[in-house]
Structure formats: C-alpha cells, structure tokens
Amino acid sequence: MAKLAICILVFALFALALSARVPREESNPAQEFLTKAQGDFNEFIEKLKALDAKKVEGLFKDGLNTVQEGLQKLNETFLQAPAAST
C-alpha cells in the first residue's frame, strides 16, 4: 500500500513539474516586418484615395518644373565649362 502511495505521489509531482513549464512566445522578426509593411501599404493606399485630378496635375507640373530647372542648370554648367582640347 505504501509503495502505491509513493508511486502516485511521484507521478503527481512529475505531472506538476511538467505542467509548470510555461512556453515563452518569442518575437518573430519576419512577422514584425510584415505587420509594419502592411501598415505602410495601407497608409499609402489611403493617401492615394485622397488624391484627385487637380492634385495629380499639380504634382505633375511641379515635378516637370523641377526637372526643367535641373536640366537648365546642367546645360548652363556645360556651356560654362571650357572645352578640352584634343
């Protein structure tokens, strides 16, 4: 009878020791990256929804003006540079 009680006690302690382990949830870098990318993508979509034809036209004109000014400065730089003699 005592042997049976000791076996049950050992089994109970063993079960208690195994159930006391709490698994730790480790952070997953890939999941964090995907969550951030999804948030950025959703923010980008919201910004696209806010654009209308006038805003797009204004952005296009601003971009075109910037490119033209850059090309003009580049052209002036080339015209001012002395030609290399061969």
Swiss-Prot record:
Cell cycle recorded as keyword: no
Q: What residue ranges constitute the propeptide?
A: 20-34, 45-86
User: Which keywords are on file for this protein?
Assistant: Neuropeptide, Secreted, Signal
For this chain's UniProt record, which GO biological process terms are given?
Answer: humoral immune response; neuropeptide signaling pathway
> What Gene Ontology molecular-function terms does this entry list?
neuropeptide hormone activity
Per the UniProt entry, the signal peptide is 1-19
On tissue specificity, the annotation reads:
Hemolymph (at protein level).
Compartments where located: Secreted
The main location is secreted
Q: What is this protein called?
A: Neuropeptide-like 2
Q: Which organism is it from?
A: Drosophila melanogaster (Fruit fly)
